[in-house]
């Protein structure tokens, strides 16, 4: 697989969708999420953050226009959370939030060609969704999807993203935050971090040669130093290149370092990694 310009497809699953409609839909949603809804381009989805009043993440979203409605998509395990959070501030607004069925099956094609349907970035690469199974393109395995996602630094819920995550910690501010838009829930914290503060940890990419075990906590530490510098959240091994790409949070005081050991909960060193810019490979 060519990680620089991969072309292929995978089936999209485990997504929750809602339709927001009504005369006040754009204005209302603009006050709830981190992007400027009025700037949405037809036929193109944008990532957004749904936040708490304290600026922490409720859910990572994809939002796009569909006719006169707005479609809101997020992780299926957050379906009830998304619905409750979006309905909480509907008072005198002329809007209606409804569950929206995801087409089944739904496929996502990673391609640099112009999108004939909804253009959406699902793993850090240009692509589009289609209901017809592609012909003549390779289907990505789960391992390849994970490697592509990690290589591009795309965080997902349950790994890099939790209810305690601030957008800037996960590097969501560039694609999923419009700092020049009007007020929205959680904006005060996000804007303050941009102007006068720094987060205590931040998502980084790492590259090493050792295969790492799945399903166990993995910690970053300076070489020869038992201090915990951070934690690995996702990793995938590229067998063709004999290298492991990983995502993890690095505590701010260790961001000047480039090389780290990977250790398990017992302190046993499992390998070494180098901090890398995205794309990692």
Where are these regions (language model features)?
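A common structural junction motif
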Residues: 36-37, 86-95, 136-144, 224-228, ...
């Amino acid at each position: 697989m060519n990680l620089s310009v991969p072309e292929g497809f995978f089936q999209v699953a485990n997504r929750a969708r809602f339709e927001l409609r009504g005369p006040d839909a754009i204005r209302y949603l603009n006050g709830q999420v981190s992007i400027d809804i009025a700037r949405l381009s037809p036929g193109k989805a944008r990532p957004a953050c749904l936040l708490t009043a304290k600026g922490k993440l409720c859910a990572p979203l994809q939002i796009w226009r569909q006719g006169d409605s707005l479609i809101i998509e997020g992780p299926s395990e957050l379906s009830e959370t998304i619905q409750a959070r979006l309905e909480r501030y509907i008072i005198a607004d002329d809007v209606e939030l409804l569950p929206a069925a995801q087409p089944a099956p739904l496929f996502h094609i990673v391609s640099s060609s112009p999108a004939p349907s909804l253009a959406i970035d699902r793993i850090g690469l240009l692509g589009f969704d289609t209901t017809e199974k592609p012909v003549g393109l390779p289907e990505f395995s789960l391992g390849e999807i994970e490697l592509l996602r990690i290589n591009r630094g795309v965080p997902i819920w349950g790994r890099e993203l939790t209810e305690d995550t601030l957008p800037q910690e996960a590097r969501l501010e560039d694609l999923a935050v419009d700092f020049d838009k009007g007020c929205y829930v959680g904006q005060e914290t996000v804007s303050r971090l941009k102007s006068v503060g720094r987060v205590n940890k931040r998502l980084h990419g790492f590259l090493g040669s050792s295969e790492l075990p799945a399903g166990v906590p993995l910690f970053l530490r300076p070489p020869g130093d038992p201090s915990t510098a951070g934690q690995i959240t996702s990793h995938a091994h590229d067998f063709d290149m004999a290298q492991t790409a990983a995502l993890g949070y690095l505590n701010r005081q260790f961001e000047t370092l480039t090389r780290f050991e990977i250790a398990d909960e017992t302190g046993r060193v499992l390998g070494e990694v180098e901090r890398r810019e995205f794309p990692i490979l």
